[in-house]
A protein has these predicted regions:
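Extreme N-terminal leader/targeting segments of oxidoreductases
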Residues: 1-32
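N-terminal FAD cofactor-binding segment of flavoenzymes
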Residues: 48, 61-102
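Short, conserved active-site loop motifs that form the nucleotide-linked donor/cofactor pocket
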Residues: 135-136, 333
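Predominantly flavin-linked oxidoreductase catalytic cores and closely associated redox partners
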Residues: 137-164, 171-304
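FAD/FMN-dependent oxidoreductases across multiple families
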Residues: 143, 257-259, 283-360
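Short beta-strand to alpha-helix junction loop
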Residues: 108-128, 283-291
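C-terminal helical "tail/cap" subdomain of flavin- and related membrane-associated enzymes
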Residues: 359-451
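N-terminal Rossmann-like FAD-binding beta1-loop-alpha1 element of flavoenzymes
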Residues: 31-58
Length: 451
């Protein structure tokens, strides 16, 4: 994209056609909403803004380092009803299976379905709709700072981490606060700024691991707050002959190298010959690419001896599993997605929680309410903290934890628990699946740490 001085306005035309006319203005452009980051969270928020009748005329600026999206991730989730992105669902399953040493179980998921959406389909659908809206503008750039402005003083810092820098931003209390977003060669102001810009890239796992190590550098292992990565490498494999039962999603197969942590294979059949097969690990540090590939090669060779296949797509990533705040903000800047603590800390599940967070934000904007981005209730946050403590301090193998939970409960109950929608009685049934002598001391330590 050519670089011009001044403020850049990309007209609402196909987002890939970034050579559209760019208008230059000597004054800072002002928008009702600025969305910093056009990933899953940023584009989900944009989608719900476009669906809200009272907000459709609001001016919106979406900023991302590139709008040339790739199929960089796969989102899976479960729900009972049609989702906001039901037309994008590539596959769904009504039966899952769990496997561990000496344990194999198939579980019907009714009334839930387990669903898959490919990242590229999601990106393209939202951006295609957005390009038809004259009130939505796009800026392709790397953001260098996000700051709070007010009517009485210049900007101070907010604790917003960008890919290239970490800004510490605290604004003074005053009326008519606005926020300023800056990038090389330009800036814009917004009445609200919603940022999902992480200080690392999820698909560059080495930068992710370096970031988490830097957060608690110098802290003794006993005093570290739990921070694990759900890191993975997956392949879409296509066999020459039918080998998969397309009706069953293999949610967790723990019969793989555990890497001194919690590791499992994730197998989602797209049809009888094709599946996404993903090696997933919960641990403090990530592996080399060769290590993921070695396990994937061995798993496929053992599971499908003599069969031939080709790899049509691969993906790699790291999702933070922690309750450490990745950013602290003040109005009118708000964090969303992983940066805004939307991810469920004990499992890394994100898509449905991001949808809930973004829908809540738009509902608050619609009703003129103060913006609250928190979505995880206190009870389920406590459960997450306890499970994280057990996994982080290796009090019990993750394979045994999940085997016990799925062995003694229906899949629908587990899904409700993992979705933070379970009742207290259902929670008790889940807890009864796990050894008290391990989880009770962990719960006490979590309570003492929070006191």
């Amino acid at each position: 994209m050519p670089k011009n001085t001044g403020i850049k306005f990309v007209e609402t035309k196909p987002y890939k056609a970034m050579t559209n006319a760019i208008h230059t203005n000597t004054e800072i452009a002002s928008y009702d909403y600025i969305i910093a980051g056009a990933g899953g969270a940023g584009l989900s928020l944009l989608h719900y803004l476009m669906q809200c009748s009272s907000l459709v005329s609001k001016s919106i600026l979406v900023i991302d380092k590139s709008f040339n999206k790739t199929n960089d991730r796969t989102w899976c989730f479960w729900n009972k009803d049609a989702s906001a992105f039901e037309t994008l669902v590539k596959n769904r399953w009504d039966t899952i299976s769990i496997h561990a040493q000496g344990f194999d179980k198939e579980l019907p998921t009714a009334p839930f379905s387990y669903k898959m959406i490919q990242g590229i389909d999601f990106y393209n659908a939202v951006l295609k709709e957005a390009k038809t809206k004259s009130n939505i503008h796009f800026q392709e750039a790397t953001i260098t700072s996000i700051s709070v402005l007010d009517s009485l003083s210049t900007s101070n810092a907010i604790n917003v981490n960008t890919e290239n820098s970490s800004k510490n931003i605290n604004s003074k209390e005053s009326i008519n606060k606005r926020a300023k977003v800056e990038w090389e060669g330009g800036s814009a102001m917004g009445s609200y700024v919603f940022s999902s810009l992480l200080p690392f890239q999820m698909n560059q796992i080495n930068t992710a691991a370096a970031y988490s190590n830097s957060l608690q550098a110098g802290t003794s292992s006993n005093n570290k707050a739990p921070f694990l990565w759900q890191h993975f490498k997956g392949r879409v494999v296509q066999f020459d002959a039918p080998v998969f039962n397309k009706a069953i999603a293999k949610l967790m197969d723990f019969n793989v190298p555990q890497q001194g942590a919690t590791a499992f294979m994730y197998q989602l059949p797209l049809n009888e010959r094709e599946a996404l097969v993903e090696y997933t690990i919960f641990s403090e540090n990530v592996l080399s690419i060769a290590e993921y590939d070695k396990v994937l090669d061995a798993y496929l060779a053992k599971g499908f001896p003599g069969a031939t296949y080709k790899i049509t797509h691969d993906e790699i990533g790291a999702i933070p599993m922690t309750q450490i705040e990745l950013a602290t903000t003040q109005a009118p800047i708000y964090t969303i997605g992983a940066l805004g603590a939307a991810i469920k800390a004990s499992t890394g599940y994100a898509f449905q929680f991001i949808q809930e967070q973004c829908k809540n934000i738009v509902d608050q904007l619609d009703k003129g309410l103060p913006i609250q981005t928190k979505i995880h209730n206190t009870r389920h946050q406590f459960y997450d903290a306890v499970l994280l403590h057990v996994l982080f301090h290796h009090k019990m193998e993750g394979a045994e934890i999940f085997e016990r939970i799925f062995a003694k409960n229906e899949a629908a109950t587990v899904f409700k628990f993992l979705s933070n929608t379970s009742s207290f009685l259902e929670d008790i049934n889940i807890m009864r699946s796990l050894p008290t002598h391990i989880f009770l001391p962990a719960a006490i330590k979590v309570l003492l740490r929070r006191a």
